[in-house]
């Protein structure tokens, strides 16, 4: 009997964990189902996910309504394979990770829904590319 393959652990980090990192986690959980264990967190977590994020992700068939922003202390104390920052605007947190990737993605906070859609589509594209690269390195 072969041992089950260990899932790749990835964490997406932004400031509030209310917009960008939540969208990235949502896409990674759907597109990497069964292959990756996905986390997200914020260096200064907000009290709730931005309602526009919930709305634009629902347009893609991904329901984030039950999720809530988490802080770095909420992450499990394990080494991550990938740490993806969304442009933290500050030094990014010390989370133990084998590989750190910086995505400079603008925060759509306070912008119209069309900007949220643009950011969502950019994140979807980045997550898809990351998962392809990850699979090719297996």
What positions do the PLM features span?
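Conserved active-site segments centered on acidic
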Residues: 2-73
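Short, well-ordered turn and helix-capping elements at secondary-structure junctions
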Residues: 42, 87-88
């Amino acid at each position: 009997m072969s041992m089950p393959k260990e899932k790749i652990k990835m964490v997406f980090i932004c400031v509030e964990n209310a917009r960008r990192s939540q969208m990235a986690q949502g896409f990674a959980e759907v597109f990497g189902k069964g292959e990756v264990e996905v986390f997200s967190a914020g260096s200064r977590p907000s009290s709730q996910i931005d309602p526009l994020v919930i709305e634009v992700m629902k347009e893609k068939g991904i329901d984030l309504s039950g999720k809530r922003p988490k802080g770095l202390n909420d992450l499990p104390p394990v080494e991550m394979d990938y740490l993806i920052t969304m442009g933290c605007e500050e030094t990014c947190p010390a989370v133990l990770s084998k590989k750190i990737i910086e995505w400079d993605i603008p925060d759509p906070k306070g912008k119209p829904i069309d900007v949220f859609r643009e950011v969502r589509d950019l994140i979807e594209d980045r997550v898809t590319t990351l998962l392809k690269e990850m699979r090719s390195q297996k």
